């Protein structure tokens, strides 16, 4: 879903410009926003002709009603204050503007989470907001149109290392580090690997994704 001929697109949580080429082709002005200076530096190197700003979902460095299209691919799951995040989206959108956002729901990486539970009792997977929490956070403002549709799918990998690498490829690791010991130890990895093998099916090791796609249209 995308608006017709948007003048300005803002990519929240742009990371190292994974979506930039596609989004830039849709608009006259593309603006990437990310909280990480390192990610922005990579994006700037790849696309020096575009604009990049450091910022966060809950405090967008943008003027009121200045954006035609707010786009965000797998960045909302890092936000604790959903109410403020959607208030910011509403604030920066022009009348008639559209926001297309996707994020992860509980149940994502369930096999990985269950396997980690056999290694230790520390959190290794983000706590994802429920669909009810997300929909409620959008109710503060009188959107012209709201759509929430979910999509579930399972990837399969030949081994655990490939599976974990694929998660890091999202832009920032969705798996939290062990804060006490830093990088994973060899023994922990072996335990995790052995446990995860019990989930193997004919296609390989499963990695579950539960995604909600959100479309919000501001009244004109």
For each feature predicted by the language model, list its residue ranges.
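A short acidic, Gly/Pro-enriched loop at the edge of an enzyme's catalytic core
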Residues: 58-70
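Conserved alpha-helix/loop element of class I SAM-dependent methyltransferases that forms part
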Residues: 1-7
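Conserved catalytic/acceptor-binding region of the Class I
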Residues: 94-160, 170-181
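A short glycine-rich, Lys/Arg-flanked "PGG" loop and its adjoining helix->strand segment in the class I
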Residues: 83-95
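Class I SAM-dependent methyltransferase SAM/SAH-binding core
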Residues: 8-59
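A short SAM/SAH-binding and catalytic strip from SAM-dependent methyltransferases
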Residues: 69-81
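Conserved Class I S-adenosyl-L-methionine
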Residues: 147-220
């Amino acid at each position: 879903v995308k608006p017709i001929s948007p003048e300005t697109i803002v990519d929240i949580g742009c990371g190292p410009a994974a979506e930039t080429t596609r989004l830039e082709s849709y608009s006259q002005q593309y603006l990437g926003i990310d909280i990480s200076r390192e990610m922005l530096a990579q994006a700037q190197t790849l696309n020096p002709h575009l604009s990049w700003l450091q910022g966060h979902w809950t405090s967008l460095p943008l003027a009121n009603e200045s954006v035609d299209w707010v786009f965000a691919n797998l960045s909302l799951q890092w936000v604790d204050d959903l109410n403020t995040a959607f208030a910011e989206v509403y604030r920066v959108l022009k009348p008639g503007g559209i926001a297309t956002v996707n994020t992860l729901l509980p149940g994502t990486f369930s096999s990985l989470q269950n396997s980690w539970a056999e290694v230790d009792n520390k959190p290794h997977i983000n706590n994802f907001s429920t669909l009810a929490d997300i929909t409620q956070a959008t109710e503060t403002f009188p959107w012209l149109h709201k759509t929430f549709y979910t999509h579930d799918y399972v990837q399969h990998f030949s081994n655990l290392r490939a599976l974990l690498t694929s998660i890091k490829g999202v832009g920032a690791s969705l798996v939290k580090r062990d804060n006490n010991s830093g990088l994973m130890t060899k023994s922990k990895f072996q335990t995790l690997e052995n446990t995860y093998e019990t989930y193997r099916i004919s296609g390989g090791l499963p990695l579950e994704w539960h995604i909600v796609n959100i479309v919000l249209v501001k009244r004109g």
